[in-house]
């Protein structure tokens, strides 16, 4: 997917939480999802209008998430409409009994480009304990097998915190066995139920980056690893890139880092527009205002695009042009300050070195 998008005008992707209802009770859930539908959810027609605005804005990708998007009977209708608007479409089904081969076939026929399943433990016991529903791991494995059988591109999502950061090698081996095209590694942001968990320390994050980098360079990865709320991985790669190749920009600068409100936008189940699901600052509602206007003009979104507002180490770091100042969501969740330094980064800028 091309990233020659002006992030001042449009995000690379928009995630719409089409429902907050889910039968799982995951320990980290940013939405604190419950197993009941909210009558205030956006209707199908309201969803169509949102999709129209996403396409008009120039955003190439929309993700339907939850909760469990399979709880929406109109999921296939939304997928078809988004495809008709020229968008790439992904969805993240929860691994509950609603996930069946027949439903995956239905999603595929509707035109979905990719599905993602969460894999948060290297064993059944680890995963099911984290998801707090027995059988979730088995359904994730079955869902991955169905996706492979159907030729449906598959992504695995894994949240890392202090409880499982030491299990990277085992998780990487498991994910590699599933035939995924993407592995999205999330660094915990303490929001929702996740506020009760302990994220990785800055030192643990640095060790995790080292493992991801080594895994990628060794060719052990036949898929792309994306890191969410860990933009400073780009700083790590820059530090370990070695001599530059003439005529070629390193991978970490050839694409733009995506940040909350700056390349990324989130709409919750009732239509509130936020910079990210992990940065749930409500900046308007799609029932009343266009997501285009909010993304381009709302003061919070404009500030998030202004690197000069960054404070602390992020404000003076020489790698700021590379990583963009780390995770604004984590800084806000931990400190209450939107532009504080990212507490998950251990790097000491050269200008602060004694």
Language model segments and positions:
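Short, P/G- and charge-enriched loop/turn segments at secondary-structure junctions
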Residues: 2-5, 249-254, 303
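Residue-level preference for beta-strand/loop junctions
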Residues: 10, 148, 259, 308-311
């Amino acid at each position: 997917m091309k990233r020659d998008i002006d992030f001042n005008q449009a995000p690379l992707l928009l995630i719409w939480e089409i429902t907050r209802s889910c039968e799982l009770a995951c320990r980290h859930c940013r939405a604190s999802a419950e197993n009941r539908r909210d009558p205030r959810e956006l209707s199908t027609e309201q969803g169509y209008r949102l999709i129209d605005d996403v396409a008009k804005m120039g955003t190439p990708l929309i993700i339907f998430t939850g909760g469990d998007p399979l709880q929406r009977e109109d999921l296939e209708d939304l997928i078809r409409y988004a495809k008709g608007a020229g968008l790439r479409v992904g969805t993240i089904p929860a691994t509950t009994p609603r996930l069946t081969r027949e439903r995956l076939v239905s999603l595929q026929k509707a035109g979905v480009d990719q599905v993602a399943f969460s894999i948060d433990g290297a064993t059944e016991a680890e995963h099911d304990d984290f998801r707090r529903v027995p059988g979730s791991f088995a359904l994730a494995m079955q869902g991955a097998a169905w996706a492979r059988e159907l030729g449906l591109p598959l992504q695995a999502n894994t949240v890392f915190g202090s409880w499982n950061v030491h299990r990277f090698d085992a998780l990487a081996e498991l994910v590699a066995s599933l035939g995924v095209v993407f592995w999205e590694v999330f660094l915990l942001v303490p929001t929702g139920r996740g506020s009760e968990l302990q994220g990785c320390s800055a030192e643990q994050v640095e060790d995790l980056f080292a493992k991801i980098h080594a895994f990628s360079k060794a060719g052990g990865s036949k898929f792309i690893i994306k890191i969410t709320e860990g933009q400073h991985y780009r700083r790590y790669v820059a530090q370990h890139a070695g001599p530059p190749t003439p005529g070629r920009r390193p991978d970490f600068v050839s694409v733009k880092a995506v940040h909350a409100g700056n390349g990324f936008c989130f709409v919750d189940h009732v239509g509130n527009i936020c910079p990210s699901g992990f940065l749930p600052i409500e900046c308007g509602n799609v029932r009343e205002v266009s997501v285009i206007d909010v993304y381009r003009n709302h003061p919070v979104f404009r500030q998030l695009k202004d690197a000069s507002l960054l404070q602390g180490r992020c404000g003076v770091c020489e790698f700021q042009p590379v990583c963009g100042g780390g995770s604004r969501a984590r800084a806000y969740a931990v400190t209450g300050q939107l532009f504080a330094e990212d507490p998950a980064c251990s790097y000491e800028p050269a200008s602060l070195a004694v």
